[in-house]
Amino acid sequence: MALCKQNMLYIILICLLVCFQNCVCQCPNGWTHHSTSCYYFSDNMKNWDTASASCQAHHAELAIIETDEENTFIWSVMTKLGGLFWLDGTDEFSEGQWEWASTNAAFDYSNWYPGEPTNSGGREDCVLTGGGYKTFWNDAPCTDHFKYVCEKTLESPIVG
């Protein structure tokens, strides 16, 4: 009897392993998967605060770029769409101290356009990328209207 139970447990374990081997994490429709995140590239132009709120309405934040590889991925999608895109970066709370607004963490990685950030006119407190800046970043007034990139972690796995 004990041997039968043990064999049954092995069979169940093997079935579970086979099922979860085909486990796929998916992004919502309209979002793009990369690494451990899903990204949404807007085609609407909004100021930085409204763009951030739009991302939050979808349980996401404006994108935080942490590596050169992630930066290159985001740029590769943006070039197909055209335009400038807001990221989550700001120095609104302390001039010259750039941080990711959603985490309050200082930049560990950055890719500023040569000579940037400049804080031109004393009011450039938000980070954008794309357009003529290519993979580079620039600071801009948060009240300007641009497209934006949202980021969220992959949703729970779907077994299939």
Q: Where are the regions that the model predicts?
A:
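Extracellular, disulfide-bonded carbohydrate-recognition/adhesion ectodomains
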Residues: 1-160
